[in-house]
UniProtKB/Swiss-Prot annotation:
The lineage of its organism: Eukaryota, Metazoa, Ecdysozoa, Arthropoda, Hexapoda. Keywords: Nucleus, Repeat, Ribosome biogenesis, rRNA processing, WD repeat. It is found in: Nucleus, Nucleolus; Nucleus, Nucleoplasm. InterPro entries: G-protein_beta_WD-40_rep, NLE, WD40/YVTN_repeat-like_dom_sf, WD40_repeat_CS, WD40_repeat_dom_sf, WD40_rpt, WDR12/Ytm1. One of its GO terms (biological process) is maturation of 5.8S rRNA from tricistronic rRNA transcript (SSU-rRNA, 5.8S rRNA, LSU-rRNA). This is Ribosome biogenesis protein WDR12 homolog.
Length: 419
């Protein structure tokens, strides 16, 4: 049998966890040269016998998406062509559709969605609030240098609270009255000695963390009255807030910070390391060494994996739970320039998005390292930040002075997590 050359047949079993698309569990003889296209035709022919409509599927062979010929995939995995091969098929995630373009006056370096709103930060030192359909609600001055990161603290029908960080070495906390569309700065957070590149609010919205070019990780109260500080009265009177905790350990800029739970933080740095911090112990719990500067990192609560963005065009997957944490689980190839930003889906266990200096966003499945699921096109210059906090929308900001909004048709309202 000449299956090694793509000629000849392979015995396969077709499996799925989506029972509505299940086919009889019997061996099927298929050509070794088949790709996803031929497998879709074959599978849909089987399903039509059950009266089902045509559906697009992706195929997992030994835990990785099939992206070429089956025989080439098996050869790469060193699998014998004489074995019976199990192929798992899943309904293909639908392509997100471009919905809107939000035009700003300068580079958009920070984006964060929550509820009905998109919060943006720009290189003209301003914050902006928008709807997903492009209605501009508010421009907020206050910082004295470009904005680098933003996050929502809380949001309801009446008020929104959020935090922004800047190259002006500060973080600023804001309160927005939605009905009157009025905003005020409630605290200026001082303590960093260089620009503040990253910020993240804790899951319980009690604290937020910042990472800076001064290599320090700082923890701040996110409450309106910082009663836990000995200097609370002075801080309240002056509007200046000081950090609750300062953690030292990185050797270069902290480019990414994310809460894994209310007492555990993930940071990524230009010093080529990821660190997991235990705030109860005020120290480092786990360190993952990489071979590239980390521009962004994202941890998934659904699968406990970490994906990183780096200067060498690649994204990498790590597992912080194992003793081999520094071992790269997968490398994702597809961007043609620095990858600046990355974020996991909060509802889809295997999906994440990235944005890069090649002007492109990409939607990935972590089981498909050789190619993204989709290219999300629209930016005319490099992408600086991407956000998928609202499962219904992927939003990104870029050096073309725009925010691009892509609508995901698969998102379910009941899965949405809005603060």
């Amino acid at each position: 049998m000449e299956v090694e050359n793509g000629e000849g047949q392979v015995q396969v079993h077709l499996k799925t966890k989506q029972e509505q698309y299940a086919v009889p569990d019997v061996p099927y003889a298929i050509e070794g040269s088949v790709s996803t296209t031929e497998l879709n035709i074959f599978l849909n022919a089987l399903l039509q016998n059950k009266g089902a409509e045509s559906v697009d599927f992706d195929f997992l062979v030994f835990d990785e998406y099939l992206r070429g010929r089956l025989c080439d995939h098996l050869r790469e995995k060193a699998i014998s062509f004489e074995d019976s091969i199990e192929i798992e098929y899943v309904e293909r995630f639908p392509a997100p559709e471009p919905q809107d373009c939000l035009l700003h006056d300068d580079w958009v370096s920070a984006v964060k969605a929550s509820g009905k709103w998109i919060l943006t930060g720009c290189y003209d030192n301003t914050l902006n609030i928008w709807t997903y359909k492009g209605k501009h609600k508010l421009t907020i001055p206050g910082h004295t240098a470009p904005i680098k990161a933003v996050d929502w603290i809380s949001l309801d029908n009446e008020n929104g609270r959020f935090v922004s960080t800047s190259q002006d070495q500060t973080a600023m906390m804001w309160q927005w009255n939605i009905a009157s569309n009025a905003v005020e700065c409630v605290s200026v957070c001082k303590g960093h000695e260089r620009g503040v590149d990253s910020v993240c609010v804790s899951p319980d919205a009690q604290r937020f963390a910042t990472g800076s070019w001064d290599t320090m990780l700082k923890i701040w109260s996110a409450e309106l009255e910082d009663a836990g500080e000995s200097t609370a009265k002075r801080a309240k009177e002056s509007g200046v807030r000081t950090p609750r905790m300062t953690l030292q350990g990185h050797r270069e800029s902290i480019s990414a910070v994310q809460w894994m739970d209310n007492n555990t933080l993930l940071t990524g740095s230009w010093d080529h390391t990821l660190k997991v911090w235990d705030l109860n112990l005020e120290g480092i719990k786990t360190e993952i060494s990489t071979n590239k500067s980390i521009f962004d990192a994202s941890h998934s609560k659904l699968n406990n994996l970490i994906v990183t963005a780096s200067a060498d065009k690649n994204l990498r997957l790590y597992d912080a739970r194992t003793n081999q944490g520094s071992v790269v689980r997968s490398t994702y190839l597809g961007h043609n320039a620095w990858v600046q930003t990355v974020m996991w889906s909060i509802t889809e266990e295997f999906l994440f998005v990235s944005g890069a200096y090649d002007n492109q966003n990409k939607l990935w499945d972590c089981r498909s390292p050789k190619a993204p699921l989709y290219d999300l096109l629209g930016h005319g210059e490099k992408v600086l930040d991407i956000d998928w906090s609202n499962p219904k929308y992927i939003v990104s900001g870029g050096a073309d002075n725009t925010v691009r909004v892509f609508k995901s048709s698969k998102a379910t309202v009941e899965n949405m997590e809005t603060k």
